[in-house]
Regions:
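Bacterial Sec-dependent N-terminal signal peptides
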Residues: 1-14
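Short beta-strand and adjacent turn/loop elements
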Residues: 11-338
Length: 338
């Protein structure tokens, strides 16, 4: 199992091939910045500070994301990637902040996948953000870079609202699951061509995928008492699931409570600071209070034919994916028994 120090970092940067060259287009293409901060060193103004410096260097960072925001669910990842590709982003900047300091990694965005691991990346580390930015600026000064980014916004674009369905939101469970199989979307393994990796990176990739396998085994364990037909599959688009005759797929979303409820089609009360989640306990139901700003998990079922979303009879979000999955499955089974 991965150690806490490994889990805390952006896993993509550990699998990149680091070179002495900056990605092509750093001052001419659009850039997305991906940030990860460990809680003990979190700075709410980090993106603003970073953007001011990148703009001064002629880097057009048109989008800022937090790493766990990108991986906020299978559909969230897919739709976020599609939105970035639609905006013709070519360069990725990863900023990792930990108690050990700052790491800045520049890479190339992929097409089918988030990162193009075949392309060379550039990385710098330091004790402060100013230190790594100065070293980036000095590197850029040694190169004859084509500058064409003249309309860079003054402030970073942080907010992104992903709509998780295109049809109707139903606050119930699809009773058709008593007859049709439920496709449960598994956590995805990470695939990188082994020829691109060194021994240490191959070990890291193996360790990462072992942890994914444990999580997927846990999903199947939670569903061990599910009385209807269920199949555990790698996630696909709705169209791909539908083509393979799967009408209903179970997925999750991981976001701050307010964003989560909006993405899933719930009515939002702007004055509400907390949400009440219904969770099963010993055959009964109890209530749990969740902070509106804290990130939580919520499972839901999507109908692949038309984009309808079934959120369940209860708002059953929870702090861990295991608890959220158990909540949704158990409450759905209880409802089907009535």
């Amino acid at each position: 199992m991965l150690t806490q120090s490994v889990r805390a970092q952006i896993f993509e940067t550990h699998l990149m091939s680091i070179s002495g060259s900056l990605p092509k287009g750093i001052t001419s293409d659009r850039v997305c910045v991906v940030i990860h901060q460990m809680p003990e060193v979190e700075d709410q103004m980090l993106a603003q500070k970073l953007h001011i410096n990148l703009k001064a260097m002629g880097i057009d960072a048109i989008k800022y994301l937090y790493h766990d925001q990108l991986y906020g669910g299978q559909d969230v990842y897919r739709k976020t990637l599609a939105a970035l590709q639609k905006r013709h982003i070519r360069v990725l900047i990863f900023l990792e902040v930990s108690t050990q300091g700052f790491a800045l990694t520049l890479g190339t965005m992929g097409t089918a996948k988030w990162v193009d691991f075949k392309a060379k990346a550039w990385q710098v580390k330091g004790q402060t953000m100013n230190e790594v930015l100065v070293r980036l600026a000095n590197k850029m000064k040694t190169l004859d870079l084509p500058y064409s980014n003249y309309l860079i916004p003054d402030s970073p674009e942080l907010g992104t609202q992903i709509r998780l369905f295109s049809g109707t939101h139903f606050p119930r469970y699809p009773t058709q699951l008593k007859r049709f199989p439920l496709a449960v979307s598994l956590f995805p393994r990470l695939t990188v061509d082994g020829a691109l990796l060194n021994d240490q990176q191959r070990a890291y990739l193996s360790q990462y995928n072992e942890r994914v396998a444990l999580k997927n085994a846990r999903i199947q364990e939670i569903f061990s008492d599910y009385p209807y037909k269920v199949e555990f599959l790698e996630d696909q688009s709705d169209a791909a699931f539908y083509k393979n005759r799967y009408q209903y797929v179970l997925r999750y979303a991981y976001m701050p409570g307010g964003e989560l409820r909006t993405a899933l089609g719930y009515e939002l009360d702007p004055y509400q600071a907390q949400y009440i989640s219904t969770v099963p306990v010993d055959g009964n139901r109890t209530l749990k209070t969740l902070d509106k700003q804290k990130k939580v998990y919520k499972f839901y079922i999507q109908k692949t034919a038309n984009g309808d979303l079934y959120s369940g009879r209860y708002y059953d979000a929870d702090k861990t994916w295991e608890d959220a999955l158990y909540n949704f499955k158990t409450l759905m089974m209880a409802q089907f028994k009535k």
